[in-house]
Amino acid sequence: MALTKTINIDGKEVTFRASAAIPRLYRVKFHRDIYKDLDALQKAMGGSDENASTLDTFSLELFENISYVMAKHADPSIPDTPEGWLEEFNTFSIYQVLPQIIELWGLNVQTDVTTKKKLRATERPMTTALFLLRCIQIGLSIRDLDLLTIGMVNDLYAESRNDECQDSYRQLASQEDFDAF
């Protein structure tokens, strides 16, 4: 289930879409890791105070690229390049748009895994490569990624690694079961 959010930018309503496919789409388009880029942007932005931020030209380009991928994912009819898309606006304020995109991304990444599951905690930060590896390990297709949030993928991965959950799903089918099917 992908999440969407409509943001008014320069008097134009723009829809952004966050789904589990975004890390892959971003990596394919820009050859970068969206998790690392969002983390760098959040640190550089320094809250909502424009004077406290350390945004440079590279940070602005990251922001534009992330915004573009999420907008293109919501509306395939927008131009095929970030530059073409940005030409549609007179102003595109990072301080107006980025907090809302980060909020949308945060909702997409939320997970429902409960603490009662006996999983080993990991100190490994989530990266696009790790996320895609987990998708492969649980057998998800690109079509599946478009329908799931990242939190849902993490839940599926956690349950696939949880022995208690795996035991409850293990059932052997008899010939009678196949005949009845």
Q: Which residues fall in each region the model found?
A:
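Charged interaction scaffolds used for protein-protein
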Residues: 1-13, 20, 32-61, 73-181
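Covalent nucleotidyltransferase core used to form phosphodiester bonds in nucleic acids
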Residues: 24-30
